[in-house]
């Protein structure tokens, strides 16, 4: 009796001339799900609170983001594959090009992406050899991106970025943002790492090769967004259920890993509009065999919203509609299917907003309503009225009679 | 990109023979706003919790009243113009007539309004000269009303009223309501004030004049509703936004001052049904030029509800509808207009109830719904479904893209 939770990132919108990509898209399968299920609108965090994809996914999995979210760093680090632990301090990082004399902090950023370097695997290996008073974990992300984690006693995330976030500026020294020993110690370690990383990178054969080819050297790692990994109970411990997250996006994979889920990225799943939707849908159907809760994340709608691409978002929704057709054949006497979004990414705003998302829950036992179209203009008329993200999974588990009674 | 929040006090009702003043009033402009906007119902505090106008206005401004409300005293004191500070203990007070021998506590209340005395300004001046172990602040309210504030170390609001709340009863001695030194100290100071105030008033020339004219002496000040002013972050500090409150009612002006708003009472604004609505609407339109959030409070609907005057409430709603016509010409690509109430004051109950209030949010970017009439019987069919007072401003700030993202 599994739950399939399909989260279409940034799916919903604000109207432009009364229309949204979702409302005008041809989407017979999504509409059929609306017709079969019980519909409503949902504030993934709370009304008027603009969700990140990380905070909203935590909430959708039943984790209060106000309690369990401490910034993007730890989630990105988990997303790229670092086995992050409570107390670790994680940073997002990018390989950059710096120039000038003296220490790393005397040098000027020439390019924040090191000439859009693609393969940093050799550089990452070299960085891992750096010796620090605490344990160091480094992992590459896509392109010039990376994650850096410091592990040891008495560290704190109350420290500043070393990334000046602009070219032509000097690399910033990490400073404590709190008047305590932990923050001071962490800042010192970060600065030691910054200098040692620069030395390792500057002298790395790959960078000599790049220089010879006229490419920019990836000779510094700039850090930002320190976050301390909180104590997050695993989904299994919390609910007794096996969770699988199917995603290609590091941030969502990170949320999955932080809560102890198995994370699957099917072949060809990319997190953009050319992703292999068939493979993702197939992976989801397979996962329903061996997991209690399967979260299927679809990213491109959000990107197309950030791009302000109305037609592109509409077209991708139509493609998605086509590709999810096999899900309509699931046995809804056993499976509970939920279709929703993590937040709105309106074309007009090009960023996340708090406009509530449509949600439909399909299962044989739901109280079906009169909604027969999946859109921002119909969902609120449904039998769920307006719910919150933190409540969604509880509603599904209740439907499946997995929920426990509170009281007698 | 400002928010205009129009709060029509006690606007909504319970039906009598299926009708409410709002549902039967002729109100083309209010209905037009409903048609242009997204509608819903709102529990200003929580479902089933009967709001005061003070607690509900705190909630509508985003302040949790369970955290920031400590009784009517401090808010009334702020409302009449006392610059109240955290830790101050404030009382509502009324000038009264007492008779008998001995101390103030041996005397009997003859009239709780001192013959409906109008001008107490000379008496207030004299009271301010009283010497106490702590600082004393006194300010007149309307008619026989006043506010009294004690300021100093170690005071508490856990003390009883001195107002016996009935004629023919003796003035009550203030007693501590908690077994601690602060409450004991405060009660002693209150009792010292009661006696000294009585002496000052009894011998005041104005009271000798009143006696000569056969009027009742205003020879005592009765205190009730002790409240300690809590630490309330200013609206500006909390949100970064400039708030203006347009109101004539002391309680609402007090809420405004407590949160650090600029408070405007336009010429002719009275807080009753003869108030100058044109002036209030004009002041609101002007305020939108220089503030981020403008709260326009309209009081008379509540009074007419307390009076159980169905026809009077209906007639005032029709007048209000006419006078707000200029607001329909606001530029809703910039301004977000919210029309709602702080609570219901049903004709049949003659007091506040928790029946949810209708709310409409008008802005170019809202997801318009099919509601085209502003009433208790239509609002719930709208796209907002059912929200809470604390969420309202967040929803508006999200619409105006002022909201910050929580997460990544």
Swiss-Prot record, chains A, B:
Give the EC number: 5.4.2.12
Q: Which cofactor does it need?
A: Mn(2+)
Instruction: Please give the CDD domains that the UniProt record associates with this protein.
Output: iPGM_like (cd16011)
| Signal peptide, first to last residue | none
Known catalytic reactions: (2R)-2-phosphoglycerate = (2R)-3-phosphoglycerate
| Activity at various pH | Optimum pH is 7.1.
Output the superkingdom of the source species: Archaea
Q: Name one GO biological process term.
A: glycolytic process
Q: Which UniProt keywords apply?
A: Glycolysis, Isomerase
Pfam families reported for this sequence: Metalloenzyme, PhosphMutase
Q: Which family does it belong to?
A: Belongs to the BPG-independent phosphoglycerate mutase family. A-PGAM subfamily.
Q: Output this protein's name.
A: 2,3-bisphosphoglycerate-independent phosphoglycerate mutase 1
**Source gene?**
apgM1
């Amino acid at each position: 009796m599994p739950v399939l939770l399909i989260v279409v990132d940034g799916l919903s919108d604000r109207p432009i001339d009364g229309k949204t990509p979702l409302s005008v898209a041809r989407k017979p399968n999504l509409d059929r799900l609306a017709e079969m299920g019980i519909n409503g609108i949902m504030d993934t965090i709370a009304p008027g609170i603009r969700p990140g994809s990380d905070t909203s996914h935590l909430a959708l999995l039943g984790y209060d983001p106000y309690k369990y979210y401490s910034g993007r760093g730890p989630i990105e680090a988990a997303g790229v594959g670092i086995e992050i632990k409570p107390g670790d301090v994680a940073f997002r990082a990018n390989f950059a090009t710096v120039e000038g004399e003296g220490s790393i902090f005397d040098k000027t950023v020439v390019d924040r992406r090191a000439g859009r370097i693609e393969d940093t695997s050799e550089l990452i290996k070299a960085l891992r050899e750096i010796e620090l008073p605490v344990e160091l974990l480094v992992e590459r992300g896509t392109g010039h991106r990376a994650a850096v984690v410091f592990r040891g006693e008495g560290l704190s995330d109350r420290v500043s970025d070393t990334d000046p976030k602009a070219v032509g500026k000097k690399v910033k020294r990490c400073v404590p943002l709190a008047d305590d020993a932990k923050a001071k110690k962490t800042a010192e370690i970060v600065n030691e790492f910054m200098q040692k990383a620069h030395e390792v990178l500057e002298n790395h054969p790959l960078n000599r090769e790049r220089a010879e080819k006229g490419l920019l050297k990836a000779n510094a790692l700039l850090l930002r967004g320190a976050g301390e990994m909180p104590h997050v109970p695993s989904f299994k411990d919390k609910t007794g259920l096996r969770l699988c997250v199917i995603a290609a996006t590091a941030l969502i994979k990170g949320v999955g890993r932080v809560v102890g889920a198995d994370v699957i990225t099917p072949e060809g799943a990319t997190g953009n509009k050319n992703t292999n939707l068939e493979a993702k849908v197939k992976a989801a159907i397979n996962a329903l065999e061996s997991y209690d809760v399967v979260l299927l994340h679809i990213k491109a709608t959000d990107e197309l919203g950030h791009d302000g691409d109305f037609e592109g978002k509409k077209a991708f929704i139509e493609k998605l509609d086509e590709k999810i057709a096999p899900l309509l054949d699931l046995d809804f006497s056993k499976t509970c299917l939920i279709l929703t979004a993590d937040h709105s990414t309106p074309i007009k705003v090009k960023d996340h907003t708090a406009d509530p998302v449509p949600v439909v829950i399909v299962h044989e036992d739901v109280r079906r309503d009169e909604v027969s179209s999946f859109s921002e203009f119909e969902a609120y008329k449904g039998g769920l009225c307006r719910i919150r993200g933190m409540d969604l999974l509880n509603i599904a588990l209740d439907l499946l009679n997995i929920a426990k009674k509170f009281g007698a």
